[in-house]
Amino acid sequence: MLCAVYLLSREGAMLTGKSITEEKGLILIDSGHGGIDPGVVGIGGVKEKDINLKIAKELAGALEKKGYKAVLIRKDDNGLYDAESKNKKVQDMQKRCAMIKEEKPLLTVSIHQNSYQDEAVCGPQVFYYKD
């Protein structure tokens, strides 16, 4: 979430040679996990998938106010797999990747709440491809 706020607050952020404020294009938002996959389950039974979806919806609203077209890959607690699928997780990931390839967004943000055994590990993580 901090990364998203940072990107939204910068007028000169560079992305593929253009500033995101010039483009005002499509941004896909992937709220990690969902359906049968809860992700990390925290103290008190809070599920990562629920936190991710809430953050994704808030981020979509903020992006739309800035003039972007924000599309949620997952809009509710359902996974992206068929009920009869033998490997739901694989099908879910394949459908997420297919949507990204088909839509060709300006940016895709995948939201997760990672957990580590080492309590000293904290803060945001950002993964990206370097072209």
Residue ranges and their predicted role:
Residues M1-L8:
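Hydrophobic membrane-insertion alpha-helices, especially the h-region
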Residues E11-I27, H33-D131:
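Catalytic-core regions of hydrolytic enzymes
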